[in-house]
Regions:
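Non-heme Fe(II)/2-oxoglutarate
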Residues: 1-85, 188-208
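Catalytic core of non-heme Fe(II) oxygenases with the double-stranded beta-helix
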Residues: 82-189
Length: 208
């Protein structure tokens, strides 16, 4: 199996999005939070009541204000992914209000075999200093626009937002292997987009 980074690893890409891009899209995502929350979701997660809970029922890359950033192609162009010809990307927005948190977790259970995925996040907006806690670097200051890539077994968390200003980030699960065989058709069409290097085009199926 081809792996993107070490499954326990952690890398940072500086200025994946510009400060101006982040300042432009963050308020639009906050504006549309209620629309994302209205999407039917039968799943149970630790994030009920937040847009993070909705990660499996839509793809934020199809949002009208996110699409022009061409994030799928930017991901495919990363040095870490240059050896790959195609990717399947699941993407969502995290909007943490006062008291909200993202508990400690990994994106694959340590006892499960490797899936060939990497978990990514880009911090967009928040008041004051905000941090993500990674298993290797510990308490790590979030820099607007920086992309963090962690392996599927790398433990990380975001502690409670102590400000009244929402904390906003984009998150991506990048898959090397087509997830279609392991999920329903409905879930597949809502949750993932497919980007191919040969055409520089993505298959986008849903809109928010």
């Amino acid at each position: 199996m081809v792996t993107l980074v070490d499954p326990h690893g952690h890398q940072v890409v500086k200025a994946f999005l510009t400060k101006e891009e982040c300042e432009t899209i963050a308020p639009k995502l906050i504006r549309d939070e209620h629309k994302i929350l209205r999407i039917p979701n039968p799943n149970e997660t630790a994030y009920v009541g937040t847009v993070t809970h909705q990660y499996a029922v839509y793809n934020i890359l199809t949002h009208g204000d996110i699409r022009p950033l061409n994030i799928p192609q930017r991901l495919l162009d990363l040095p870490q992914l240059q050896h790959l010809d195609e990717l399947w990307i699941q993407a969502w927005v995290n909007i943490s209000h006062l008291g909200d948190e993202i508990p400690k977790h990994t994106h694959n259970h340590p006892n499960e075999p490797e899936q060939g995925l990497i978990a990514c996040s880009v911090y967009l907006h928040g008041r004051g200093n905000n941090y993500t806690h990674f298993e290797d670097t510990g308490k790590t200051l979030n820099i607007v626009g920086d992309l963090h890539l962690v392996g599927e077994y790398h433990e990380h968390q975001v502690r409670k937002n102590l400000n009244t200003e929402p904390r906003v980030s984009l998150a991506f699960d990048i898959h090397v292997n087509d997830p279609k065989p392991s999920v329903s058709h409905k879930e597949y069409t809502k949750r993932w987009i497919h980007i191919r290097r040969d055409t520089n085009q993505s298959d986008e199926r849903t809109n928010v």
